[in-house]
Amino acid sequence: MGFECSAESASWGTIREKVSLKENQEEKRMERSVAIVLAAGQGSRMGGSVKKQFLRIGSYPVLYYSLQCFQNSENIQEIILVTGEDYMSYCQKEIVDLYGFTKVTRIIPGGKERYDSVYAGLLACKECDYVFIHDGARPFISEEIIKRGLDGAKKTGACVVGMPSKDTVKLADENGYVKETPARNLVWTVQTPQVFRYSLIRKAYESMQSKDMTAVTDDACVVEQETGVKIWLA
């Protein structure tokens, strides 16, 4: 009798462990991260007729490298590609289909400005817990950067990938004179991807729609101004 009770207890313990493990696995599966890759820029600083995201580095276009990194990442479940309306067919045939980017579920037209394209990408997200916003003309990302960004976003809801500045930075006044020299250890140069809890960045962008966004230079600016959430630097 004692042995049977002990065996039954052990059996129920094993079942509970399996159920708990299954619940944890399902919870992890439910958490989805979407990468919004922006490829609608004009690339005016580069000159020439070919947009910089379509220029080739080695054997592949610049855009290929970031899409490939997101495609291979276990932390990314879906990619939304935002490009110029005239380039949607090109991106589908010559980028997505040609290189087998199966995580790209939608190619959508961008807007006049970068923030318009970001907002279009956010509206295209259907099931998303975290969103990576990345400039497709920046090819040098890695799985380590993706993980760093996601870990940071899980801490506060917002994370900007960047590097501590190696250069001394001067703040100027409106007349072009040095106004202030911030301590170099407090200055970062930020990059993309920038990673956010989806509900946070969506709310911030919606709040900004009725305001002047010409001074917005990155997505973190929108979160800073509209939510007050502290943004983690990683």
Residue ranges, per PLM feature:
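Short, Lys/Arg-enriched N-terminal segments with co-localized hydrophobic residues
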Residues: 16-29
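N-terminal glycine-rich phosphate-binding loop and ensuing alpha1 helix
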Residues: 31-88
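Residue-level signal for inorganic ion chemistry
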Residues: 37, 63, 121, 135, ...
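Conserved donor nucleotide-binding strand/loop of the catalytic core
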Residues: 99-112
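Active-site nucleotide-sugar/metal-binding loop of Leloir-type enzymes
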Residues: 119-130
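Conserved core of the sugar-phosphate nucleotidyltransferase
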Residues: 140-232
